[in-house]
Amino acid sequence: MLKLSEKEAFETISKDQLIELFKMSAQLMLTIDGLWFVEAEKIMGIDQAMKLDQGVWRQFGSLEANRMKKFLTMESVATLEDVCKIVLLSPMWVSVGPQAEIQNDRCYLSVTNCLPQKARIKRGLSELPCKSMGTAYFEGFAPALSPNLKFKCIFCPPDKHPNDVWCKWEVGWF
């Protein structure tokens, strides 16, 4: 009988395959959230589904920030470079085409490939007005990274947005 551990299975694939596996896992995480939301929307309507989802994303933002800090052995986040690194490596962000740039003492985070929105459009649904969910996420995420870290939405549906960027957020100590 052959027994393999998880670690041994991971060691049988290349670094590039590990990266792709991570990206696929991140996409699956958002897929299950999207599928849950569509079913909740059918049962209870969009307003109640959004209210539930906001609570989930607020908790998730805090949990993700704390786990990423632990994974990266960061006790606290002291620089915008740290913020960008955490975002670019986090499972939630990896699957949405993240872009991070630092300009004028601010970190600007953009979503360029929003899989949940694309899936809704493909199903014939309208864009989800997800600004309140993004806000809830950052209400948990930003202070968990650093108590005085602030965020501001530049645009997010239902706001108008460019075709190549779904939402954009400003993060910093302001």
Question: Each PLM stretch: what is its role?
Answer:
Residues 1-108, 115-117, 121-133, 143-168, ...:
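N-terminal accessory segment detector
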Residues 134-138:
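Long, well-ordered alpha-helical scaffolding segments within enzyme catalytic domains
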